[in-house]
């Protein structure tokens, strides 16, 4: 399985074939029987579909919700060449208000890079808040060790963020930055103090990181493709 792969020039058919031939050899050595990819390519790219079909892949592109491993539909913010002030000015008035409200109410934020020493208490706080979020919203949550290993593996390309109120962690996120994109990967919030809007401030801090890194896109990640008001 290659999440969001392949990582190469998808128009270079020779490179693509060499890449997948190599992947097939690895799969055979590991007794694999299936290769799955979730490429970051628009569904309207018919040439890519033809190229992948020629390589033996079958396109499954009819799902509207979260049937796959990676989301088919994402929400992205265009920040190419924009300053913080320009990006903030394009937010809805209520969004700007909530970002400022969090700071006004005394919410503070802190981040740790994956290539640095992340305090165990920070990882524990994030994992605990994730458990709270999972129970509230009814989804399975990864372990603390999983998040620690992921941050360590991604190194300087990942950050753990926590929001605090009166010294207590109340919200947390993990973001990753590669090339010209920054991804909001995980988010968690306490059942308490949600009225001080810590998530808005954390989102803004991650967007600021994306702007500082010269990114073109800030990706909020998965949303449903079914826009019906009746869709839960």
Predicted features, each with a name:
Residues 13-25, 194-208:
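Conserved acetyl-CoA-binding loop-helix of GNAT-fold acetyltransferases
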Residues 1:
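Catalytic phosphate/metal-binding cores of nucleic-acid and nucleotide-processing enzymes, i.e., regions
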Residues 220-232:
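Conserved catalytic-core subdomain
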Residues 25-32, 54-60:
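Structural alpha-beta junctions
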Residues 7-11:
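Short acidic, S/G/P-rich loop/turn micro-motifs used as interaction or catalytic elements
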Residues 34, 95-97, 200, 204, ...:
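Tryptophan-centric aromatic hotspots in well-structured domains and transmembrane helices
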Residues 27-41, 210-222:
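Conserved GNAT acetyl-CoA-binding A-motif
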Residues 39-195, 207-209, 225-226:
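A conserved beta-strand-loop-helix scaffold within acyl/acetyltransferase catalytic domains
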